[in-house]
Amino acid sequence: MAAEQYYGTGRRKTATARVFISVGTGKVTINDRPLDEYFGREVARMIVCQPLEATDNVEKFDIKATVKGGGSFGQAGAIRHGLTRALMAYDEAMRSTLRAAGYVTRDAREVERKKVGLRKARKKPQFSKR
């Protein structure tokens, strides 16, 4: 396999991604499937490739990711976060560019739990005055 590979763990909502990058031709594999096949929506594919575009490394690295949990956009965000960390492991000079783009910070927004006595997390039952 690759002589030197760099690793990053990414998380978003309930999705967790393990991302390995190695110098190559720009091949992206997610759960042993190509990027186009794994993500049907173009927006999800764009989210995954954003760190590469921000650092002008689109066809410089081969990416192999395994991702579990969450939906398609949560998984795409987790891969983006892991890819960002892997790129920083490869070259620490990329950190400032990636931070300016907002990819270094983990998006901490999670689903709020449903509370007892309410219909959803915050939706209350209809109020009747009389």
From Swiss-Prot:
An example molecular function term from Gene Ontology annotations: RNA binding
| Superkingdom in the source lineage | Bacteria
| Keywords for the protein's UniProt record, in alphabetical order | Ribonucleoprotein, Ribosomal protein
Coiled coil, from the record: none
Q: Name one GO biological process term.
A: translation
| CC terms in the record's Gene Ontology section | cytosolic small ribosomal subunit
UniProt-listed HAMAP family: Ribosomal_uS9_B
The UniProt entry's sequence similarity note says: Belongs to the universal ribosomal protein uS9 family.
Q: What is this protein called?
A: Small ribosomal subunit protein uS9
Annotated source species = Teredinibacter turnerae (strain ATCC 39867 / T7901)
